[in-house]
Amino acid sequence: MTKRILVAVDGSEEAVNAARFAASEWPDAEITLLHVINPADSTTGAEGGFPGAVDQWYENARNRGERLLSEAAAAVDADVDTRLELGRPTATILDVANGDVDDDADPFDHVVLASQGRTGLSRVVLGSVAEGVVRRADMPVTVVR
């Protein structure tokens, strides 16, 4: 029986649909929505090389992540937990899923994520995140289209 579900959320409607799917498929499970802030994104903005820019970028990314999680949680017809982490998306999703981030955390039973939540280059990146999670996860993974 699936008890703990981790759903990766990137702000796309597809990711929100993945969260809705998880809530409807496993109504009695503990669902956690996870958004990963990718530090590699900090060097892609126009302000990338200025002093203090990384701190400002991180604050903006954290605020955006909290907003995305709040919006996704509100869109799901279930009680869900939210979690915000900093790291490379694939590795961080897997670490959280395996319970490797917190010393006292149990592993999740299942991971749910969207196949491709964005367009253009970010679509390729998200697709590679989904593929990486599917290939390396120690637990079942559901990819929602």
Feature names for model-found ranges:
Residues 74-111, 136-139:
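Structural beta-alpha unit
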Residues 3-47:
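Small/aliphatic-rich secondary-structure junction motif
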Residues 37-64:
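Acidic, proline/glycine-rich short linear motifs
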Residues 65-69:
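N-terminal membrane-insertion helices
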